[in-house]
């Protein structure tokens, strides 16, 4: 049984890697492999997102360990010289095999607005108001939900009217790491301020991704919004302050 084990994941070229958080205390279970019994545990686990096509290599990893080995002896002096134990500690290296993964290109026919998303996703939107005064703030919230490479996708753009003052978007990632990738939500908030009165339309937002189940590209759309802006003395200072203080 291993008393200690030391090793680290090498640099994986061509991959974006994320480590799965595992319990600090390792639990060993008995497994039968190739005619022998082994005490096994999951030492570390990573989710890999390939960033290029072709043959990508996961190098061999060497773990340095200290193993408790039982001493098969009837001589009581052996236990005495081993500190009263029937086990001795020996140093042992474990070498994992090198792996080569063949990564295919995505199919041709990518939509012009392809986000880089690969997985299964949905998108929804909401707006804080559709009737406001000049210099008031309007905020649109997009939520991209699903399972896949959520952290790596390009966020959609909202096409505000040209007379609106537009602020940098704020992103809140709420992910859980699973064997299938990242599961959860990417929440994007957009803030803009109309400087002129009038009726305006904010077009629908498109989000295109590659769907793993159907092996096809899919494009999702939100609803468009119509805004009625009246001339007035709106004040967006507090809304702007709250928005800009949010962490990306």
Which residues are covered by each model-predicted region?
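Surface-exposed interaction/ligand-binding surfaces
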Residues: 1-248
């Amino acid at each position: 049984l291993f008393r200690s084990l030391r090793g680290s994941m090498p640099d994986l070229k061509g991959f974006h890697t994320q480590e799965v958080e595992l319990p600090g205390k390792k639990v060993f279970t008995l497994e039968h492999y190739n005619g022998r019994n082994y005490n096994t545990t999951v030492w570390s686990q990573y989710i890999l997102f390939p960033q290029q096509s072709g043959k990508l290599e996961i190098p061999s990893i060497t773990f340095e360990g200290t193993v408790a080995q039982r001493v098969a002896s009837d001589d009581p002096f052996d236990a005495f010289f081993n500190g009263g134990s029937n086990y001795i500690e020996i140093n042992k290296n474990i070498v994992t095999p090198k792996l080569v993964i063949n990564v295919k290109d995505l199919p041709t026919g990518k939509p012009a607005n392809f986000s880089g998303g690969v997985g299964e996703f949905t998108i929804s939107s909401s707006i804080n108001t559709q009737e406001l005064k000049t210099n008031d703030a309007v905020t649109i919230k997009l939520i991209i939900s699903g399972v896949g490479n959520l952290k790596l996708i390009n966020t959609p753009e909202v096409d505000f009217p040209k007379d609106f003052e537009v602020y940098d978007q704020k992103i809140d990632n709420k992910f859980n790491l699973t064997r299938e990738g990242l599961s959860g939500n990417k929440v994007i908030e957009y803030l803009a301020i109309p400087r002129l009165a009038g009726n305006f339309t904010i077009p629908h937002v498109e989000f295109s991704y590659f769907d793993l189940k159907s092996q096809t590209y899919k494009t999702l759309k939100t609803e468009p919004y119509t805004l009625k802006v009246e001339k007035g003395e709106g004040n967006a200072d507090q809304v702007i302050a709250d928005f800009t203080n949010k962490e990306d």
